[in-house]
Curated annotation (Swiss-Prot):
Protein name (record): Glucosamine-6-phosphate deaminase
Keyword Iron: no
Top enzyme class: hydrolase
Superkingdom of origin organism: Bacteria
Gene that produces this protein: nagB
Organism: Corynebacterium glutamicum (strain R)
Xref: NCBIfam families: nagB
Annotated function: Catalyzes the reversible isomerization-deamination of glucosamine 6-phosphate (GlcN6P) to form fructose 6-phosphate (Fru6P) and ammonium ion.
Membrane-spanning residues: none
GO MF, any single term: glucosamine-6-phosphate deaminase activity
Disulfide bonds: none
Keywords noted in UniProt: Carbohydrate metabolism, Hydrolase
Length: 253
């Protein structure tokens, strides 16, 4: 696991984009996350695309998750969100951006179908954020560390947190389709980004805590090619922060 500590959110985005861009140029398969954490990364990748530094025209992309009951064109679907925040601004083919089928009346069937589709591909680089409690995608604490794509009932706090995107809290879906931690772990490379003091406990658990379902992010300690990129605030509770900075400086380029 590589730990990169950056000055601020913008620098986090630049560092993450620099790792991801070579895979895009090669026409790789990307794993995309939504939420606030990867926004600076997407903004930097868009800037690089507009500057002619990278192309996504031969890429495929898989989203982490989707609300059960929402169509892809629903304004609150994650597929719609990733289009607004990223894929509509680059040259990736829209039909090559895949997400779980939240509109399938049988969500368990949708989960199995999405798992099979991902298994048929090899995700070259997976972009991840992390929740304040260490959750990745909708894999909350106590999720199986080897779990596959599944239907996940949303924690009441998650419903409350996401209510700001809907007209009323009653409109927030109560379930989501999400890649499991076992699914995510099959990605060839993982880049997790986190910023802000609110993520400091989760980053400490992910990097320096035991590998445990109590902190889903800790599964990345078992991955051969995981990179954690954080700002100073998110790194503020790491006991070995100075060591990580030194290791990054001494890395052979």
């Amino acid at each position: 696991m590589d730990i990169i500590i950056c000055k601020d959110e913008q620098e986090v985005g630049k560092a993450a984009a620099a790792l991801i861009a070579p895979f895009a140029t090669k026409g790789g398969t990307l794993g995309l996350a939504t939420g606030s954490s990867p926004l600076s990364t997407y903004q930097e990748l868009i800037r690089m695309y507009e500057a002619g530094e990278v192309s996504f025209k031969n890429c495929k992309a898989f989203l982490l998750d989707e609300y059960v009951g929402l169509t892809r064109d629903d304004e609150n679907s994650y597929f719609k969100t990733i289009r607004k925040e990223f894929t509509d601004h680059i040259d990736i083919v829209d039909e090559e951006v895949y997400s779980p089928d939240g509109a399938n009346p049988d969500p368990y069937e949708a989960a199995a179908e999405y798992e099979a589709k991902i298994a048929a591909e090899s995700v070259d680089v997976q972009i991840l954020g992390i929740g304040g409690n260490g959750h990745i995608a909708f894999n909350e604490p106590s999720s199986s560390l080897s779990g596959l794509t599944k239907v996940q009932a949303l924690h009441p706090k998650t419903v409350e947190d996401n209510a700001r995107f809907f007209n009323t809290i009653e409109e927030v879906p109560t379930h989501a389709l999400t890649q499991g931690l076992g699914t995510l772990s099959r990605a060839q490379n993982i880049v997790l980004v986190a910023t802000g003091e609110g993520k400091a406990d989760a980053i400490r658990g992910t990097v320096e805590g035991p590998v445990t379902a109590s902190c889903p992010g800790s599964i990345l300690q078992m991955h051969n090619n995981a990179t954690i990129i954080v700002d100073e605030a998110a790194a503020s509770k790491l006991e070995n922060a100075d060591h990580y900075r030194l290791m990054e400086q001494l890395k052979l380029r």
